[in-house]
Amino acid sequence: MGKSAFLKRVLMGGACALVLAGTAMAQARSFDVPAGDLKAGLDAFSRQAGVQLVYRIEDVRGLRTVGVRANAEPEEVLSRLLAGTRLSVRRDSSGALAIVREAAFPDSEAASVEEVVVTGSRLKNVFDAATPVVSMDRTELLEQGYMDLAEALTDIPGVEEAVSLANSQTATQANGLSTISLRNLGANRTLTLIDGHRTVSNAGNKNAVSLSSIPEFFVDRVEVTTGGGSAVYGSDAIAGVVNIITERRLDGVRARIVGGTTGDGGGDSIEYSVGAGGRFMDDRLYLMAGATYDRQFRLAATDRDRALESILYQPATNTVVTPDLSSNSAGGRFVSGRWFYDESGLKPNFVTAINGYETRNNGTLITPRDNLNGAVKFEYNLTANVKAWGQALYSNVTTDSVREATTVSNSTTFGVNDEFSVGRMSRTLNPFAPTEIKSAASSSGIDFRRRVVEVGPNLIHNERETLRSWVGLEGSLANDWDWKLTYGHGEFNGEQIRGNTLNLQRVQWALDSERVAGVVQCRNAAARADGCVPLNIFGVGSITPEMADYIRADTYYRQNNRQDTIEGYVAGPLFQLPAGAVEAAFGFESRRDHTETHTDPRIQSGVASSSFLPEFEGTIKANEVFTEVSAPILSDAPLAHRLVLNGAVRVADYNLESVGTTVSWRAGVQWSPVPDLRIRSEYARAQRAPDTTELYSPPRDDADTVVDVCSGVTATTPGVVAQNCRADSRIAASMAASGGVFRQLSTSIKAPNAGNPDLFEETADTLTLGAVYRPAFLPGFEASLDYYDIRISDVISSLTNAALLLGCYSDPNGTNNVFCQTITRDDSGQLVRILNQEQNLNETRARGVDVAASYRFDLEQWRVPGRFKASLNYSRRLELSTEYNGISSVETIDEVGAVGTAKNEAKFGLNWSDDNWSVRWSSRYVGSVVDSLEREQQAIAMGWADPLYLYLDDYWRHDISVSFTPDRRNPKLKVFGTVRNIFNDYGPFLPDGTDSGNQYNYNSTYGVVGRAFTLGLQVEF
């Protein structure tokens, strides 16, 4: 059990005394004492140990135990059962075992005796790790009202959101996911485990686990271990491991309901959960089952005044345009804007700031989500030394997102390689065009831009179904050795339906119409025979329902991920040293990951306006063997109260020719010169093989918010970038037609990602060095300081859109370079596409310092009731950078100090509890940042004294949670509530055009909800 979980149990515990009478048996034996009520656990221990326990009922009533499953001596088992109760085992002068109260029991020592899956190791009796472990237990998750594990974990410094409901509205494949990233190194470098086991990826575009598919109701605690973990768990554990440890010993029935709302309206939520468990067949069989359903309602842009502020920032000139409207209007804009339609009819001289279309009104800030989860578990004791077990987790997550209606123009391209364009309308044959527009058009035809609102807003429906299951056998051998054999199967099926998109081939046919014998018809005979309906785009509401039905395309995309694993290991003591037993583990793992996708034929042929998602299939297989060892070198020696060395090695063989065989390893040391101080260090080599999408996927569309480096460029703007922008004839023509300045019309750009079959593994060398201090003179206090350095060579990544744009246009030799080959502009110079292909870049490096401290105390001497705990978690980023080969030299992308990668982050907490109440105040701090480091460099180069929206102040968010239990010693009923973001701080104002902002003027790092409330009730019976 982590220190956080232990402290919670301490706060809920009471003083008690227990006397053990009789003779304790000296030899080790097998124990299986269930978690739950302490009295029941002590009775079970008494039966299994063959000893008599004497205790006062009132002293143990309401206390709980974590349970023990082990082959151990009774004294050790009893000590484990009492972990977290402020009781410890002592032998009196007569030789009998006794239980005495220790007011200042060290947190981690109490935590170290729990029989759990130890994150970061498979060794039996190794509880202190050489790398930092931060945990969040069930009580904290419950009382803070979190329904999403990712949202809860991002309160921990160093844990960042990767994808969330607040930042994936425009994403093609990630919409509605909920993933995290350790050290900002990416969700695919954070290995997520469930009870120490790998689990199938349920993200559409990378190897990542969406935490929304794991029901928080069934989670006992979550442990986050930083540092390379590939030697223990295999590929992907580059930045660290998130181990989600599920409920193991639910006795009886537990039910919960939680409701949430926001102070400014919208974004409500509700959760219903129920679970039941019990023992049968003379306690040989344990069964548990449960289900949870939660709904996150939509938070629309219209629910927040800030989201509707229509502002466009132009970074090239450090100016603001307001209102920030789209030139793709609902009535159509024709002949380069010389004519347009509004509600009153045909008008001359379109001005975007006056006549444009406001896209924000249909926007979504929080994607609505329905989440149904189920879980079943069983354990069956086949013999006294062998147990069969199994568990399955099912998740069905649906999300629905709404976006503004699709736009179409004469330069809109379609086809697999964008080889076709919709094209101009005939100025002589089109039967709907008025005389004014026909007369103004050139001989090449009528150019146009039109938002097709009559078809309806874009609707994106995602359904993600995930099944995870494991079955296994485990048992004990002679000489205190244990073994475990597990088979796991996981399957993810995702389907996306994109409604109200356009069939661009049909749009082309329908626009190419004529009047014959007084009847308007499509000119293409084959299209006409297939039911072509001529399309009238001239005017607001000019598209009839029949026209809309003909060009509408509701498309689908389906993906299936499957994972099968077989793993086994044995663990136990190799031999004894004077300081203790040398513990070891030996094991194997065989894994197969398979991905296949199926795409709507209209998407495959490229005629649908929805993002292009290709069909592909790929399989990765890996066979691995591993070993771990921990050796206590010294104990109770001068300047060596404890000295332990540990190490691990894993050899993996892949079916990928570019990867082959990899070797991961780690070596660590823990040294306590005195009992109060523990120094820990570990050096590890970790690998991550490319996943199926990174290897096999053809280019697949995605939509990113991209600020064009050419936006705002004028004839006099200095610098190489501006010079290269003006050299593009399309941009120059657009400048001439727009008053001498080039303006980006939309920052929503297609940014397709492509795999690369030549990728090979990335390799990380990680160092952690730190210390833990628990002074005996200050009971209840603990502090730790850790330094980390992660260096990833041959890092698998694609360059950012900003890096590709800058690499293209900052070349003094012009735009004939590899970066410009990834960039596509339309006939008017507008940025429409940037291709991102995965490649092995030079290096990514992350360095920093983590500080943690907690102090548990009471103020009884001042007659203040209750117990207190103060805590601090602080993270200081020293470096986060990526190197890649530029035009003529190695370029470096620095990220520290920008939005999302602040130099300083911290979380402060103060808890108070008594026999009935628990109150928790927490504060999250994000240090001052800049919108982007590229913008800061530009501002310095331009000499701007006051660059807009660049320098952003510190951010604080304060939360409070309160819970009430009528009888804490028998906590069958609990009422709890939270207020998050008490002071309703939305963070910095970041409009469209800033690198980290968007058209709704926020960044999800700071949240988009504002003040939020939850109220819940939990009962057990």
Residue ranges of each PLM-predicted region?
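Short, acidic, small-residue-rich periplasmic hinge/interaction motif at the N-terminus
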Residues: 42-44, 48, 94, 100-142, ...
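Gram-negative outer-membrane beta-barrel transporters
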Residues: 645, 782-935
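Short acidic/polar hinge/loop motifs at secondary-structure boundaries
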Residues: 197-226
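Surface-exposed, low-complexity loop segments enriched in small/polar and acidic residues
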Residues: 299, 305-312, 339-369, 375, ...
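C-terminal beta-signal and adjacent terminal beta-strands/loops
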Residues: 791-793, 878-881, 923-937, 964-1021
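Short loop/turn motifs that connect adjacent beta-strands in outer-membrane beta-barrel proteins
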Residues: 249-253, 265, 281-284, 383-386, ...
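Extracytoplasmic beta-strand/coil segments of soluble accessory domains associated
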Residues: 97-100, 125, 154-198
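N-terminal periplasmic accessory domains that precede
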Residues: 97-102, 149-152, 178-181, 210-212, ...
